[in-house]
Amino acid sequence: MKPSEKKENTLSHLAIIMDGNGRWSEQKGLPRENGHKEGVKSLRKLLRYIDDFKIPYLTVFSFSTDNWKRPKSEISNLMNLLRKFIQTDLIELHNNNVKLRVIGNRDGIPKDVIRLINSSEYLTRDNDGLYLQIAFNYSGRDEIAVSYTHLTLPTILLV
């Protein structure tokens, strides 16, 4: 297809499940932590180029509720990656007009990480460029249960 024949992008939301980074690392004989770090590097590359494709929404599933079953050292490394990502990349994201939102259950997440999440969401709240959602401590089942509770609670209270 010639460049002049390219159609405008109709994709409005890209969702990525960041899975397999630890296995990738193990296959290469490296610690699982290295794979997780490579996953963050890939996310940074994607964030640099996603604007070229005019995709307004990006959701990255980075830590599922099942990840709590992993060894404590691995969980700690994953929390540190989110910490470091926010601390290192927040200003660049903000300067590039990215609106950052972290979705998922905040129970169990260290308080300092929650403060970083809250401050990053607050800082970028008025940005109207890429809408980046990071699903952290997230599961579809949990989301259904929470939605059900929110839908039925008013009914239960009225009875």
Predicted feature locations:
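Flexible, compositionally biased loop and terminal segments
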Residues: 1-151
